[in-house]
A protein has these predicted regions:
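Conserved catalytic cores of phosphodiester-cleaving nucleases, focusing on short active-site segments
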Residues: 19, 38-61, 68, 76
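Acidic active-site catalytic centers that drive phospho-/nucleotidyl reactions
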Residues: 12, 37-39, 52, 72, ...
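Acidic-basic catalytic patches of nuclease active cores, encompassing PD-(D/E)XK
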Residues: 1-29
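Domain-level recognition of nuclease-like catalytic cores that cleave nucleotide substrates
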Residues: 86-122
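Mid-chain, well-packed structural core segment of small domains
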Residues: 61-92
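Short, glycine/acidic-enriched loop or turn micro-motifs at the edges of active sites
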Residues: 31-33, 55, 99
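Short acidic/glycine-enriched loop/turn segments that link adjacent beta-strands
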Residues: 33-36, 105
Length: 122
């Protein structure tokens, strides 16, 4: 596995542990529909959270959140629409971003709740 893929997997693993420690139930990881993917779908307090995970080894360059641009957000929303229909979801759905900076399983984690919403794009 390429180094950046290993870092991404370690970041997603750390994000899942973080979410579980905060009382979230993980419904799916890396859920795919056609060419779209949702990193993490979690549930807590009657809400579904679609969470995009961005991991970097350092913050010398672009901040991880900057990698979730308009085009990426549109793909996440389209994948979420498919997810909602496929699983017949009735609960409210929110879009979060978790950014991780670090390596070797040691990360600074930031959970940005309600990072974006559908109203901004339609």
């Amino acid at each position: 596995m390429a180094k950046h893929n290993e870092l991404g997997k370690a970041g997603e693993d750390a994000a899942v542990k973080y979410l579980e420690s905060k009382g979230y139930t993980i419904r799916h990881r890396n859920w795919r529909f056609m060419h779209w993917e949702l990193d993490i779908v979690a549930y807590k307090d009657g809400e579904v959270r679609v969470i995009e995970v961005k991991t970097r080894s350092n913050d010398d360059f672009k901040e991880p959140i900057e990698a979730v641009n308009h085009q990426k957000r549109m793909r996440i929303m389209k994948a979420t629409d498919a997810y909602i229909k496929y699983f017949n979801i009735d609960e409210p759905v929110f879009f979060d971003i978790i950014t991780l900076v670090g390596s070797d399983g040691i990360f600074d984690i930031e959970h940005i709740k309600n990072a974006f919403n559908i109203r901004h794009y339609y």
